[in-house]
């Protein structure tokens, strides 16, 4: 299956996925070139240059059970970020581990894995996201987050 087909399957709910909301913040800079993060924290500083949203309803360890199970196996991870006006998506590999973090979700370009990692070897970090989307997030708008996994066969 192609990456485009995987994105479409996740968007249509035909693959294990979880959908929840977070919120942008005036201090979103999205300048980090190695990772991106969504946090449950209600506030962020400009030093958190990987953080693209706060006030998340979920952290990595709180994702739907079928998503957590799929993250522990081989597959393609799709992260879709949608404000209603602007959207972007990130593709990565499953970490082959079940995340347990109760505070954050992290997508990494590297192969590093910790308790918050939901994707490794991703094609984008915070700095690679659509800048129109980042501008909207800086205004503090609500963000619809979709995390899905297309298992490898």
Describe these PLM feature segments.
Residues 3, 7-152:
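Conserved mixed alpha/beta catalytic, RNA-binding, or beta-rich assembly cores of soluble enzyme
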């Amino acid at each position: 299956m192609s990456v485009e087909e995987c994105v479409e399957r996740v968007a249509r709910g035909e693959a294990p996925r979880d959908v929840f909301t977070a919120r942008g913040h005036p201090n979103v800079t999205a300048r980090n070139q190695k990772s991106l993060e969504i946090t449950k924290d209600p506030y962020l500083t400009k030093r958190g240059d990987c953080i693209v949203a706060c006030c998340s309803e979920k952290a990595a360890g709180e994702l739907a059970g079928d998503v957590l199970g799929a993250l522990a196996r081989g597959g393609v991870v799709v992260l879709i970020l949608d404000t209603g006006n602007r959207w972007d998506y990130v593709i990565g590999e499953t970490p082959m581990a079940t995340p347990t973090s109760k505070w954050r979700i992290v997508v990494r370009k590297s192969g590093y894995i910790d308790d918050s990692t939901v994707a490794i070897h991703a094609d984008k970090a915070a700095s690679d996201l659509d800048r129109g989307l980042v501008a909207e997030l800086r205004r503090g708008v609500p963000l619809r987050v979709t995390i899905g996994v297309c298992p490898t066969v």
